[in-house]
Amino acid sequence: MNRLIILVVAAVFLGMASAEEDVLKRGFPCRCDSDGPSVHGNPLSGTIWVTSCATGWHKCNSENELFHECCKQG
């Protein structure tokens, strides 16, 4: 029984750790200036951040939005 509890706790801990790594991969994609013109099929390399870009990210388009920014990591 104790082994089962330890196994469950370890599984939950590992699940939380992997979810934390995926946080930066989530969000809605947006078009950076480096993506080229707005044509169907172009990749969207930016991620929308509310209010301003996070540490380690930079604004990647020239549009001025009031409540969000299109940011790229790096």
Curated annotation (Swiss-Prot):
Location(s) in or outside the cell? Secreted; Nematocyst
What protein is this chain from?
Answer: Delta-actitoxin-Amc3a
Provide the positions where the record notes the PTM Glutamine amide: 73
Organism of origin: Antheopsis maculata
What Gene3D superfamilies has UniProt attached to this entry?
A: Anthopleurin-A
Among SUPFAM superfamilies, the record links this protein to: Defensin-like
> What is known about what this protein does?
Inhibits voltage-gated sodium channels (Nav).
InterPro entries noted in UniProt: Myo_ane_neurotoxin_sf
Which keywords does this chain's UniProt record carry? Amidation, Cleavage on pair of basic residues, Disulfide bond, Hydroxylation, Ion channel impairing toxin, Nematocyst, Neurotoxin, Secreted, Signal, Toxin, Voltage-gated sodium channel impairing toxin
Residues spanning the membrane: none
Signal peptide positions on this chain: 1-19
Q: Which GO terms describe its cellular component?
A: extracellular region; nematocyst
Q: Name one Pfam family in it.
A: Toxin_4
Pro-peptide positions?
20-24
Family of the protein in this entry? Belongs to the sea anemone sodium channel inhibitory toxin family. Type I subfamily.
Under Gene Ontology molecular function, one entry of this record is: toxin activity
- Which residues are reported to carry the modification Hydroxyproline? 29
Report disulfide bridges, numbered on this chain: 30-70, 32-60, 53-71
